[in-house]
Amino acid sequence: MARREEETKEFEERVVTINRVAKVVKGGRRFRFTALVVVGDKNGRVGFGTGKAQEVPEAIKKAVEAAKKDLVVVPRVEGTTPHTITGQYGSGSVFMKPAAPGTGVIAGGPVRAVLELAGITDILSKSLGSNTPINMVRATINGLQNLKNAEDVAKLRGKSVEELYN
């Protein structure tokens, strides 16, 4: 039991959306709840998950478990992203641009949750296209996955970091 308590303290979780869905059967409608949750340690690891259940707390619990299974490591430079990136999923895209220290997280709804839990403190972002919460979260995580540090790029090119900037 103590191990589970430690595990939950490691990650902060944020519920992005809860949706009531209905299945129409012969006797009427059967309602269930879906939950979209983002988890992160505010230190470069973030993930999202969805859960569906008869009750809201149960759906959230399932979503948190799913989110912890699929974490992404986000490269950061002084609290922001190393470079400008656009993440895409479906018809939704999220444009993210590094910002100067003190700017804060300029992002809307689901995108803000992902960026804050990833530990990014200064960033400018704009959501384009589809604004469905799940698509926004997936597009944001897609963009964060495609980020590269200067060290990684230098290694891929077989050069030193100093040579990249000259």
Curated annotation (Swiss-Prot):
Recorded hits in InterPro entries, A to Z, give: Ribosomal_Su5_D2-typ_SF, Ribosomal_uS5, Ribosomal_uS5_bac-type, Ribosomal_uS5_C, Ribosomal_uS5_N, Ribosomal_uS5_N_CS, Ribsml_uS5_D2-typ_fold_subgr
Q: Name one GO biological process term.
A: translation
Got any disulfides in this one, which pairs? none
Q: Which GO terms describe its cellular component?
A: small ribosomal subunit
Q: Where is the S5 DRBM domain?
A: 11-74
Q: In Gene Ontology terms, what is one molecular function of this protein?
A: rRNA binding
| Stated family | Belongs to the universal ribosomal protein uS5 family.
Domain notes from UniProt: The N-terminal domain interacts with the head of the 30S subunit; the C-terminal domain interacts with the body and contacts protein S4. The interaction surface between S4 and S5 is involved in control of translational fidelity.
Per its UniProt record, what HAMAP family does this chain match? Ribosomal_uS5_B (MF_01307_B)
- What is known about what this protein does? With S4 and S12 plays an important role in translational accuracy. Located at the back of the 30S subunit body where it stabilizes the conformation of the head with respect to the body.
What is the protein name stated in its UniProt record? Small ribosomal subunit protein uS5
Q: Which organism is it from?
A: Staphylococcus epidermidis (strain ATCC 35984 / DSM 28319 / BCRC 17069 / CCUG 31568 / BM 3577 / RP62A)
